[in-house]
Amino acid sequence: MASNVTNKTDPRSMNSRVFIGNLNTLVVKKSDVEAIFSKYGKIVGCSVHKGFAFVQYVNERNARAAVAGEDGRMIAGQVLDINLAAEPKVNRGKAGVKRSAAEMYGSVPEHPSPSPLLSSSFDLDYDFQRDYYDRMYSYPARVPPPPPIARAVVPSKRQRVSGNTSRRGKSGFNSKSGQRGSSSKSGKLKGDDLQAIKKELTQIKQKVDSLLESLEKIEKEQSKQADLSFSSPVEMKNEKSEEEQSSASVKKDETNVKMESEAGADDSAEEGDLLDDDDNEDRGDDQLELKDDEKEPEEGEDDRDSANGEDDS
């Protein structure tokens, strides 16, 4: 963007021009300034100088919006001081009569513009602008170095004044009385301290006793738990042995029942065999009786036949 646009002194250009003071130009460049202020409107000119810059907008509304939005903003560790070029802040100038920017610009001798189209306008040099703003606005320079640390002055020793013997005697008496008073005070303080120490010791003793009691309780509980844990395996073993014994007895009972059932079955089988034998014997006897009965009528018939034979003869 053209930088000579910011040199125009016509009222319209002055009212739409923004002055950016307290700018850290060592870090902030022209492109940064344009990027920051382009969001408020179209920029037709921008110039960056040592410690300050100018931004030329198309109209005054955009310039005022930029002043309202960016004044007091911190950039590169410095708080910006922004206002319209035609309306400098009153409380910023140095002591003395403050003149408006138009008056300051008007006091400068006019010179023709380099371009024929801008022959009616008047441009100013950057040097003049820098001098003008340096005169009108005071900006803090770099932070001055801290003052050197003053060396500690060692006070000179006082010379002892030698007095007469009477003064020495009085001073000795006073020192003795002071020592006595201090000793009595120290004795009282020692007594108070001793009482306080005794109280603290008694409190500590009580705490220690309570701690010992709690430790004894804990030890007793632990011993009980240990006894329970020791006795529990024995009980488990006893229970297991009882269960084994009961299972063995149950098994024995089952075997006895089986044996008895088997013996009963054998007895019943033997009884059945005996019964079968008896039946067979009875059946044999019956058959023999039947045979005897059959023989008897045959014998009768033989007797009859023999008798009939005898009769015939």
UniProtKB/Swiss-Prot annotation:
There is a cross-link at residue 258 (Glycyl lysine isopeptide (Lys-Gly) (interchain with G-Cter in SUMO)). The modification N6-acetyllysine is found at residue 176. The keyword Cell membrane does not apply. The keyword Magnesium does not apply. SMART domains: RRM (SM00360). The modification Phosphoserine is found at residues 113, 115, 121, 162, 166, 229, 231-232, 241, 246-247, 249, 261, 268, 306, 313. Residues 16-87 form the RRM domain. Residues 191-226 form a coiled coil. A motif (Nuclear localization signal) lies at residues 155-161. PROSITE patterns: RRM (PS50102). Residues 175-186 have a biased composition (Low complexity). Residues 139-191, 219-313 are annotated as: Disordered. GO terms for cellular component: actin cytoskeleton; nucleus; pronucleus; protein-containing complex; spliceosomal complex. The modification N-acetylalanine is found at residue 2. Signal peptide: none annotated. Residues 250-261, 285-294 have a biased composition (Basic and acidic residues). It is found in: Nucleus. There is a cross-link at residues 8, 50, 89, 94, 176, 224, 237, 240, 251-252, 258 (Glycyl lysine isopeptide (Lys-Gly) (interchain with G-Cter in SUMO2)). Belongs to the RRM HNRPC family. RALY subfamily. This is Heterogeneous nuclear ribonucleoproteins C1/C2. The lineage of its organism: Eukaryota, Metazoa, Chordata, Craniata, Vertebrata. The gene is Hnrnpc.
